[in-house]
Amino acid sequence: MRLRVLVVIITFAFLAGCKEKPAATVKEVNALDEKSPDAPNPVEDPRFKEFFDHVRAYIKIHDAASTRVPNLKETADPQQVSGREKALADEIRIERAGAHQGDVFSPSAAREIGDIVAQDFNVRPVKDQHAILAEVPVKVPPAINTDYPTALPLATVPPGLLLKLPTLPMDLEYRFLGRHLILRDIKANLIVDFIPDAVPAAPSKSKIAGREAHP
């Protein structure tokens, strides 16, 4: 009995010392998210050449910053993990001190990607649109070189939509923050760039009710 109490105390102390991380969200996969052999290969799409050039330029900054941060040995200590994450983010901020929204998502890429996101959402059931937007209600717009909010969940991009977006290197990922599409540095938990209001506003529940009442 004393041993069990000790284990519970140690477990509680470990969890209390952990830095809160963005919680991953789980979505149901519907027919729109089933992988299709006809899915486009966006890596080869010439529309995104400028975007890929910007991504490669960012990865060079990320890699250079990473060499100035001590390597993390295999550890389960969350404080060491979060400490390196913060140190890496700080180094990247120094290198990108003058970064602005649109430096990676060029205007042409933002338009193309915005169209892809809008077309995908517009064919999804309204309840699914509301569910995605409700996951990360955000009142303050994102800012470049800031941390992805750890108090908010990491709203996942539907798999079917990911198949249509330009493929990213392993250190970057797409995330939603409200209606904004975020380009997130995974190892630094950093907002690299974003497309404002990439997700179209879902119809209000009152409008949906009105349509159902007057078909």
Regions found by a protein language model. Give the residues of each.
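Short stretches within intrinsically disordered, low-complexity N-terminal or propeptide regions
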Residues: 15, 25-26, 211
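Amphipathic, charged alpha-helical segments and their helix-to-coil junctions
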Residues: 130-215
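Mid-length scaffold segments of soluble, non-membrane domains
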Residues: 83-157
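Post-signal peptide N-terminal segment of mature Sec-exported envelope proteins
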Residues: 25-46, 50
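Positively charged n-region of N-terminal signal peptides that target proteins for export
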Residues: 1-5
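Bacterial signal peptide processing site
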Residues: 18-21
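Early exported N-terminus immediately downstream of N-terminal targeting peptides
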Residues: 45-109
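Bacterial N-terminal signal peptides
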Residues: 6-14
